[in-house]
Amino acid sequence: MVAAKTIKTLVWKSELPDNIKEELYNKLIEYNKKYKLKKAEVEAIIEDAVNEYRKALVEPGEPIGTVAAQSIGEPSTQMTLNTFHYAGVAEINVTLGLPRIIEIVDARKNPSTPVMTVFLDEEHRYDLEKAREVARRIEGTTIENLAREMSIDILNFEFIVEIDPERLEKSGLDMERILKKLSGSFKSAEFEAEGYSLIVRPKKVTKLSDLRKLAEKVKKHRLKGLSGVGKTIIRKEGDEYVIYTEGSNFKQVLKVPGVDPTRTRTNNIWEIADVLGIEAARNAIIEEIVNTMREQGLEVDIRHIMLVADMMTLDGVIRPIGRHGIVGEKSSVLARAAFEITTQHLFEAAERGEVDPLNGVVENVLIGQPVPVGTGIVKLTMNLPLRPQRE
C-alpha cells in the first residue's frame, strides 16, 4: 500500500490542471484504501489520466469558434419558432426553441416569459398544504386577480369591485386586510366594504378621467406576494412538491420561509448574475441552452455551448454575441468592418490610428493571406543546401 504523501507527490508532478489533480488524488486515496495499490500501479493510473487529458485537448490551430458556431447553428435550424407550454405545466407558457436560444445569446435583460422553479425545504416539500402556504407567500395577488367583476358608477362617482369569495379564500386574505392595505397606500381615496363588494370613492376628484386613473391604480395594486411574480403552480415531482411561477424575482424568493435557496432557479440569467455572481450566470447559460436543445430532441456537444458561455462571461459581466457585444468589440479593425457598419468602423479606426495585427480569420481572408488556422498557424522556413562556391 502506497503512502498518501507519495500519491500526492506523484499526482502533483503530472501536467494535469489543478482541479483534475485534486479529483485524481481523492480517487487514488479511495482506491488505495480499497485495493492496496503498489507504486507502479499508481504511476500507471496517473499516466493513463495524463494520456486521456492530452487526447481531450484541442489540436493547435483548430478553429474552435467556427466549429462551435456550426455545431450550435445547424441543429438550431430544425428548432421550433413558437412559445410552448413549460415541461408539462400547461398553465405556464415559456419561450422555447429558437426564440429562447436567441434570447440567451443576445443577453436580453428581460426574457419574454420569465419563470422560476422554486424547490422547498425539508419541512415543506412533502406536504401539499405546506407547499400551498409557501406558494401563497410568493404569488403576486392584486385586486384584479381577486375580482369577479369591476365597474365604474358614473352617477355616484365610485369604483366598485365585486370580490370572488373562492379566490379570496385561496389567497389567504380577507376584506378587512384588503381595506387596511388599500387605505394605507391610497391617501386620496376612501374605501368601504359591503359584504364582498369593495367601494372606492375619490376624496377630491371631479373628473371622470381621474376616477378611471385611480381605478387602474387600485386594480393593479399588489396586496401580497413578490413583485414581478404572477400566478404559481404546484406540481408533484417524485416524492416532493415543486412550485413554478409566472414571472421572476430571484433575490426575494430566496428569502421566503420554506424555500430551498440551494436548488431554486430562474430562467433570467441577469438576475442570477446579480444575486449569485458571474460563475453561476455562466452555468445558467450552459444549462438553459442545453435544456432548450434537448426539449427539441437535439444533442449538441456541451463543449461548444461552454465556449459560448465562456466568451459571454469572460469580462465578469454578461455580454451579448453581436454588434453590441463580442463581435463589436473585436480587436481587429477589419473584422469589425467586415461584420457591419463598415465605413463607420474604418473612419473611427483611422481617426484613432489603430493598427490591425491580422491575427484572425476574417481579416486575413479580406487581404488574401493564408488564414492562421490549422496548418496556416505554422510558420516554416527551409534551410536549402548551398552549393559550394566555385573558385
Swiss-Prot record:
Any Pfam family: RNA_pol_Rpb1_5
Species the sequence originates in: Thermococcus gammatolerans (strain DSM 15229 / JCM 11827 / EJ3)
The protein's enzyme class: transferase
Gene Ontology annotations for the cellular component aspect, listed alphabetically: cytoplasm; DNA-directed RNA polymerase complex
Protein name: DNA-directed RNA polymerase subunit Rpo1C
Molecular function as annotated in GO: DNA binding; DNA-directed RNA polymerase activity
Record note on quaternary structure: Part of the RNA polymerase complex.
Gene that encodes the chain: rpo1C
Record's function text: DNA-dependent RNA polymerase (RNAP) catalyzes the transcription of DNA into RNA using the four ribonucleoside triphosphates as substrates. Forms part of the jaw domain.
Keyword Cell division attached: no
Subcellular location: Cytoplasm
Principal subcellular localisation of the protein: cytoplasm
Alphabetical UniProt keywords: Cytoplasm, DNA-binding, DNA-directed RNA polymerase, Nucleotidyltransferase, Transcription, Transferase
Superkingdom of origin organism: Archaea
Keyword Plastid: no
Cysteines engaged in disulfide bonds, as pairs: none
HAMAP family: RNApol_arch_Rpo1C
Recorded family membership: Belongs to the RNA polymerase beta' chain family.
Gene Ontology BP terms: DNA-templated transcription
Reaction catalysis annotation: RNA(n) + a ribonucleoside 5'-triphosphate = RNA(n+1) + diphosphate
